[in-house]
Structures are given as C-alpha cells and as structure tokens.
C-alpha cells in the first residue's frame, strides 16, 4: 500500500477518511442523520473511486465527476445491503430518510457525474467500471 501511495501520489487524507468511515461497518449504531450517511458514502464510495482514478492518472479536474459517480455507485450498493443490514438488527437508514429519498440523491449525483464526464480521460474510465449498473439499481428502488 505504501508503494502504491508513493508511486501514484495518492492523497493519504482520502485513504484516512475511508478507513475511519469503514468503522461504521463494524459498529451497531445507526448513522446519526442523513448528513452522516452522506458523509459515509462520500468517504467510502466516492473516496475509493477517486483513489482508483488517481492511480490511473486522473487529473485534478476529474475529481468532481469521479466522486459524484462514486457516491452514486456507493449509494446503489448501500441500498442493496439494506435488507441484510436490517435482518441483522442494524438501522441503515437514518430517521426521516427513505430508501427512495436516498435513491433520488444517488440519481442526482449520477446526473452530475454524467454531465461532467468529459473531464474524465479515457484511460481513467476503468476506475468507474464498478458502477456500470448503478442507474439500473437506483431506478429499481424508486
């Protein structure tokens, strides 16, 4: 990991926030509110996709598009996990936030990413492949 960070100049702060956010996965407390869940999605899915894109040479100008796509992709994955999390006694959605609301937010981020897709060089696009079914799943939630 050290060599990857060094060789590709990956932003360590993004990795630190990713690790800190993943602690939620091992605890039973729900996200405090919708902003807490949004921060979790930003620090995990958006951050991880940005790290992958940087490792493939993404310029700074691609960050917003890549992060928005990562957020949407993380949202789709999170919503897919909601039934299992509930079955395990977890409370994955904060009070006042429905799965449909979260899916709408994910679709908005996806639209944001798509409108800025020209900022993402062709050689960086493999970092985005994890999200190829994002829209399909988010639409199903609605």
Language-model features, listed with the residues they occupy:
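Hydrophobic pocket-lining residues within nucleotide cofactor-binding pockets
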Residues: 53
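Acidic/His metal-coordination segments adjacent to aromatic residues that form catalytic metal sites
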Residues: 24-36
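Catalytic cores of Mg2+-dependent Asp-rich isoprenoid enzymes
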Residues: 1-4, 8-23, 37, 41-50, ...
């Amino acid at each position: 990991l050290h060599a990857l960070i060094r060789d590709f100049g990956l932003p360590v702060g993004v990795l630190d926030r990713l690790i800190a956010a993943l602690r939620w996965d091992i605890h039973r407390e729900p996200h405090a509110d919708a902003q807490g869940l949004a921060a979790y999605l930003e620090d995990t899915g958006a951050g991880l996709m940005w790290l992958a894109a940087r490792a493939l040479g993404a310029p700074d100008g691609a960050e917003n598009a890549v992060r928005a796509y990562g957020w949407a992709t993380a949202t789709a994955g999170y919503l897919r996990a909601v039934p299992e999390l509930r079955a395990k006694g977890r409370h994955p959605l904060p009070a006042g936030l429905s799965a449909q609301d979260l899916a709408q937010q994910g679709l908005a981020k996806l639209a944001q990413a798509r409108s800025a897709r020209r900022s993402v060089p062709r050689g960086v696009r493999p970092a985005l492949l994890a999200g190829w079914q994002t829209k399909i799943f988010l639409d199903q939630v609605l």
